[in-house]
UniProtKB/Swiss-Prot annotation:
InterPro entries referenced in this protein's UniProt entry, alphabetically: FAD/NAD-bd_sf, MnmG-rel, MnmG_N, TrmFO
Assigned EC number: 2.1.1.74
Function: Catalyzes the folate-dependent formation of 5-methyl-uridine at position 54 (M-5-U54) in all tRNAs.
Pfam families in the cross-refs: GIDA
GO biological process: tRNA methylation; tRNA wobble uridine modification
Reaction(s) the record says it catalyses: uridine(54) in tRNA + (6R)-5,10-methylene-5,6,7,8-tetrahydrofolate + NADH + H(+) = 5-methyluridine(54) in tRNA + (6S)-5,6,7,8-tetrahydrofolate + NAD(+); uridine(54) in tRNA + (6R)-5,10-methylene-5,6,7,8-tetrahydrofolate + NADPH + H(+) = 5-methyluridine(54) in tRNA + (6S)-5,6,7,8-tetrahydrofolate + NADP(+)
Domain of life: Bacteria
Necessary cofactors: FAD
Record protein name field: Methylenetetrahydrofolate--tRNA-(uracil-5-)-methyltransferase TrmFO 2
Length: 446
């Protein structure tokens, strides 16, 4: 049996999930977090597991890969999923949270755990002889980044993503905007929709692509590497005049109450438990703040919008996981060092959490002399870990949960006449069922 103390660097989603999982297995944890000493440009709260991009953990539906992933994590006793359900706010078929309540719940659970020692400190040195889980996230400090570079022998791991603005609900003009979920999913209408005619859209588009961008703190636009899942809306727009119509401004399933179709729709999603703040869905941005006020006020219904937070751009880091980590997210060159979270190349809140969860289970097995295990790729959890272990070394790109990375299944079409959409739904239901069964088998063996 090895030393039953683990250093965890970073009290974000992956780090807190891992700390909880190790502590419940009676393993002592030293959890290092720097934010109470100095915050990065997008952090606001003092608590752990702060959500700095969207407040949504995305779909809860089992026919969706990330919905199935959440169910897998429930079966694995995920602290993060429990916190999200505690802090949940209405969001149709999605799991969205009040950021403050969510962080407070996790901070309390971690801080009160007798097996976890929280240390407010910027880690400047990593002891290669101590068991360490690096879960420093996509905003790793420069000093820690230098240490990681020494460990992996490579400093080519960076990208940028962006944060969407938040506005006050009472400043939204509900004579123009209307409440509706896409295709009327869910029991309540949780999204506020701002419709646009073709003329309004083209005027908005023209201003957006010509707006001033805040680049003073960036090394040059040519060097930017954006996450597809959190791309600035202005960068997306520059791909073509219709690009936004198939992205954050997609009008399908969002007709006006009288049935009239829109050329484009901007959606707003509840951001707090008190239903006072709404974020502009998919509108992560790096525009200068006066430009955000000017251009986003062109959106019908937001002409008098009061912005409580403007969008900002921030640097994120990830490593070349297929090159430097084994399938247990353990450093190939040092068995004492593990990684988890977005720094490994999983993209998304829930994905980060599950990497911390599974890695913690394997660290516990490693300490206790048991065989380390990874869930089958029939599960979403296993498929994610399999992806970051076996993806291209020369062009590794972060990945969200999706059915495309899960093992293919044999699916027989029903004899009766069904639509393509019905077939897709039935197939996804079957994949989800097998994924959940796979996790149940994994649990039996750990």
């Amino acid at each position: 049996m090895k030393n039953k103390t683990v250093n965890i660097i970073g009290a974000g989603l992956a780090g807190t999930e891992a700390a909880y999982q190790l502590a419940k297995r009676n393993i002592k944890v030293k959890l290092f977090e720097v934010k109470r000493i100095t915050k990065n440009p997008v952090q606001v709260l003092d608590g752990f597991a702060e959500l700095v991009c969207s407040n949504s953990l995305r779909s809860n539906e089992l026919t969706n890969a990330v919905g199935t992933l959440k169910e897998e994590m429930r079966l694995l006793d995920s602290l993060i999923i429990r916190a999200a359900e505690y802090a949940q706010v209405p969001a149709g078929g999605s799991l969205a949270v009040d950021r403050v309540l969510f962080s407070e719940y996790i901070t309390k659970e971690i801080s009160s755990n007798e097996n976890i020692e929280v240390i407010d400190l910027e880690v400047e040195n990593i002891n290669p002889n101590e068991l360490t889980l690096i879960a420093s996230g996509p905003l790793t400090t420069n000093k820690l980044q230098e240490q990681i570079t020494k460990l992996i022998g490579n400093d080519d791991f960076y990208f940028y993503d962006a944060v969407a603005p938040i506005i006050e609900k009472e400043s939204i003009n509900m004579e123009i905007a209307y409440q509706k979920n896409r295709y009327d999913k869910g029991e309540t209408s949780d999204y506020i929709n701002c419709p646009m005619s073709k003329e309004e859209y083209l005027n908005f588009y023209k201003e957006l692509i010509n707006a001033e961008i805040s680049i003073g703190h960036l090394p040059g636009e040519a060097e930017l590497k954006y996450f597809e899942g959190c791309m600035p809306v202005e960068a997306m727009a520059k791909r073509g005049v219709d690009t936004l119509l198939f992205g954050p401004m997609k009008p399908r399933g969002l007709n006006k109450p009288d049935g009239t179709r829109n050329h484009a729709v901007v959606q707003l999603r509840q951001d707090d438990a008190n239903d006072r703040l709404y974020n502009i869905v998919g509108f992560q941005t790096n525009l200068k703040w006066p430009e955000q006020k000017r251009i986003f006020s062109m959106i019908p219904g937001l002409e008098n919008a009061k912005f409580v937070r403007y969008g900002v751009m921030h640097k994120n880091n990830f490593i070349n996981s297929p090159k430097v980590l084994n399938k247990y997210l353990q450093l190939k060159t040092n068995e004492n060092i593990f990684f988890a979270g977005q720094i490994t190349g999983v993209e998304g809140y829930v994905e980060s959490c599950v990497s911390g969860l599974i890695t913690a289970i394997n660290i516990a097995n490693f300490i206790n002399g048991k065989e380390m295990q990874v869930p089958s790729s029939k599960s979403v959890s296993g498929a994610l870990l399999n992806y970051i272990n076996k993806a291209s070394i020369t062009n590794f790109q972060p990945m969200k949960a999706n059915w495309g990375i899960v093992d293919e299944i044999e699916f027989k079409r029903p004899n009766r006449k069904v639509t393509k959409q019905e077939i897709k739904k039935m197939k996804n239901e079957k994949i989800s069922e097998l994924a959940i069964d796979s996790i149940k088998d994994f649990i039996k063996n750990i």
